[in-house]
Every structure is written in structure tokens, then in C-alpha cells.
Swiss-Prot record:
InterPro entries: Toxic_anion-R_TelA (IPR008863). This is Protein KlaA. GO terms for biological process: response to tellurium ion. Keywords: Plasmid, Tellurium resistance. It comes from Escherichia coli. Belongs to the kla operon, which is associated with cryptic tellurite resistance, and IncW plasmid fertility inhibition.
Length: 257
């Protein structure tokens, strides 16, 4: 607040008097980051698609988990299915699905790192544009106060025909700066929303990858290596399977809303 007060004092005491002393420079007052540029910057960042790519990868994992349900290989085959080799076929499909899931999970970890890089870039952009909003607000407030406190500044002299109207041009400039500030505020809001969604998805995925995935891998490995599968083992594997699927599905909730 102290820095902004000093800035306001400088604007009203130095910058604005000089501006009205040389009205040709009114158009340069408050020049800074263009609002369209800020939106393009956000658009370009999101077009790299790290957040969308992670969401897509998680969706693929959830879909593939349906093929790796441990209860499928735990079902007792009929004599006819045994004769046709369906039991072995189910085990092979389960092993293939598990291997595919391992690959997808590893790929998702790589995409998650890209999301972290995106978040760092978003943080830098947020800092820049929040500072720009504060700067524009100071310029607008200083300009309005200056006009109120100096009613003769830039006004036409009585009885003199003047084609240039500095006071009107400056008032119009302040209105344009207010529009620009609103554009920056909209960009900041969009960045914060995008960031919040990405952080939530990344946090959920990271927690899942560090806690539930190792448990799931442990149980599925036990199923494909044991020669004596029992109901308790299958139940634990199914529990880990459902917990992983539920957690990954929840990580997509903020993005899909």
C-alpha cells in the first residue's frame, strides 16, 4: 500500500502535470501490457495441452482398469471353458491389461511433470498480470483525482477556439484504461480457475501414484505369480483395484465440470 501511495503521489505531482503541459503525450499515459496479449499468452500456454493430456491419460487408465479387474481371473471356469482354454485366455488378457496399465501409468507420470511446468508458467503470468491490474488501477485513480482536483487542467480557455481538447482526450483515455484493466482482471480470473483445476487434478494424481498405485501393483503381481489363488487374496486385489479406479476418476471431476 505504501508503494502504491508513493506511486500515486508521483503520478499526480509529476507525471500528470507534465502530461497536460505536453498534451500530445496523453495517448501514452498508462501504457503497458496489452489485454489481448495477455489472453493470447494464456491461450498459447494451454494449447501445449499438458493439463488436457494428463486428463486424457487418466481417462485411458480408468478405461483400461476395467479390463484388469482381478475378479475376472478369479471366476471359476466351467468344464467347457476349461476345454476351450478360456481360463488361460482370461489370465493372458489380465496380464496384458496389467502391463498396458503399467505403461500408461508411467506415461502419465511424464505428462504430470509437464503439468508442473505449466503451473510454474501460470504462476509467473499471474504475478505479472496481477501487478499490471494494480498498476492500471493506480493510473486510473490518479487520473480521476487529478481531474477532480484540477478542473482547469486541459480545459478550453473562454473565448478561444481550440481544436485540441486535452481534458476530453484524457477522460477518454481513462475510460480505455478501465476497459483494459477489466480485460486483465478477466485474464487473471481465468488463470486462477485454470490453475486451481490443474493443481487439484495434479495433487489427486500424485497422491494416487504415490500411495494407491504401489498397493495395486503389489496385489496384481501376487495374483499373476501365485499358484494358489484364494478368495482373500482376490478380495484384497479387488479392493485395491476399486480404490485406484475411484481415485483416478475423482481426479478428473474438476476438469470435466
Amino acid at each position: 500500500m505504501e508503494e502504491q501511495s508513493v506511486n500515486m503521489a508521483r503520478l499526480k505531482g509529476e507525471v500528470l502535470p507534465a502530461l497536460f503541459a505536453s498534451p500530445a503525450t496523453i495517448g501514452e499515459y498508462g501504457a503497458g501490457i496489452d489485454g489481448a496479449d495477455s489472453l493470447n499468452e494464456l491461450s498459447n500456454l494451454m494449447e501445449h495441452g499438458a493439463v488436457a493430456a494428463l486428463a486424457d491419460k487418466i481417462s485411458q487408465i480408468v478405461a483400461k482398469l476395467a479390463d484388469a479387474d482381478p475378479r475376472k481371473i478369479a471366476e471359476k471356469p466351467t468344464w467347457f471353458e476349461k476345454m476351450l482354454g478360456r481360463e488361460v485366455e482370461r489370465q493372458v488378457r489380465y496380464q496384458v491389461a496389467r502391463k498396458t496399465l503399467d505403461q500408461l501409468l508411467d506415461e502419465a507420470e511424464g505428462v504430470a511433470q509437464r503439468v508442473r511446468d505449466t503451473l510454474r508458467a501460470l504462476d509467473d503470468m499471474l504475478n505479472t498480470h496481477e501487478a499490471e491490474v494494480d498498476r492500471l488501477r493506480a493510473y486510473i485513480q490518479a487520473g480521476r483525482e487529478f481531474l477532480d482536483e484540477n478542473p482547469e487542467a486541459g480545459a478550453a480557455k473562454a473565448g478561444v477556439i481550440e481544436f485540441d481538447k486535452p481534458r476530453e482526450r484524457f477522460a477518454r483515455k481513462l475510460a480505455n484504461l478501465a476497459t483494459l484493466m477489466a480485460s486483465h482482471e478477466m485474464s487473471v480470473t481465468q488463470m486462477k480457475l485454470t490453475r486451481a483445476q490443474a493443481v487439484d487434478m495434479l495433487d489427486r494424481f500424485s497422491e494416487t501414484a504415490s500411495v494407491l498405485v504401489p498397493v495395486w501393483r503389489q496385489h496384481t503381481l501376487a495374483l499373476i505369480t501365485t499358484k494358489n489363488m484364494n478368495p482373500a487374496m482376490v478380495a484384497e486385489a479387488a479392493k485395491a483395484h476399486q480404490a485406484l479406479m475411484r481415485s483416478l476418476s475423482q481426479s478428473l471431476e474438476g476438469i470435466n465440470q
